[in-house]
């Protein structure tokens, strides 16, 4: 097997993980910003704002783990040798 294919798989896996990490960081930041803004506007609604925040953060992180699964598929399913 050509080493270029293995190198391409590793580079592609790294790009997948980098994109997922950047996306998760941006998504968590936007959700956190919305939470802080909502609590600053209405402090009494703090309890009602935490549930959608944690659901949103969980979905954003789930998307990151889906990226992790695709990275593992691309890197480890590449035939070597």
Swiss-Prot record:
UniProt protein name: ATP synthase subunit c
Recorded GO MF terms: lipid binding; proton-transporting ATP synthase activity, rotational mechanism
Organism lineage string: Bacteria, Bacillati, Actinomycetota, Actinomycetes, Mycobacteriales
Membrane-crossing segments per the record: 5-25, 57-77
Membrane-protein topology: Multi-pass membrane protein
SUPFAM superfamilies: F1F0 ATP synthase subunit C (SSF81333)
Family: Belongs to the ATPase C chain family.
Keyword Ion transport tagged: yes
Function summary: F(1)F(0) ATP synthase produces ATP from ADP in the presence of a proton or sodium gradient. F-type ATPases consist of two structural domains, F(1) containing the extramembraneous catalytic core and F(0) containing the membrane proton channel, linked together by a central stalk and a peripheral stalk. During catalysis, ATP synthesis in the catalytic domain of F(1) is coupled via a rotary mechanism of the central stalk subunits to proton translocation. Key component of the F(0) channel; it plays a direct role in translocation across the membrane. A homomeric c-ring of between 10-14 subunits forms the central stalk rotor element with the F(1) delta and epsilon subunits.
Gene: atpE
Organism: Mycolicibacterium gilvum (strain PYR-GCK) (Mycobacterium gilvum (strain PYR-GCK))
Coiled coil: none
GO CC terms, sorted: plasma membrane; proton-transporting ATP synthase complex; proton-transporting two-sector ATPase complex, proton-transporting domain
InterPro entries according to UniProt: ATP_synth_csu_bac/chlpt, ATP_synth_F0_csu, ATP_synth_F0_csu_DDCD_BS, ATP_synth_F0_csu_sf, ATPase_proteolipid_c-like_dom, F/V-ATP_Csub_sf
Location of this chain's protein in the cell: Cell membrane
Organism domain of life: Bacteria
Quaternary structure and partners: F-type ATPases have 2 components, F(1) - the catalytic core - and F(0) - the membrane proton channel. F(1) has five subunits: alpha(3), beta(3), gamma(1), delta(1), epsilon(1). F(0) has three main subunits: a(1), b(2) and c(10-14). The alpha and beta chains form an alternating ring which encloses part of the gamma chain. F(1) is attached to F(0) by a central stalk formed by the gamma and epsilon chains, while a peripheral stalk is formed by the delta and b chains.
Pfam families: ATP-synt_C
UniProt keyword annotations, A-Z: ATP synthesis, Cell membrane, CF(0), Hydrogen ion transport, Ion transport, Lipid-binding, Membrane, Transmembrane, Transmembrane helix, Transport
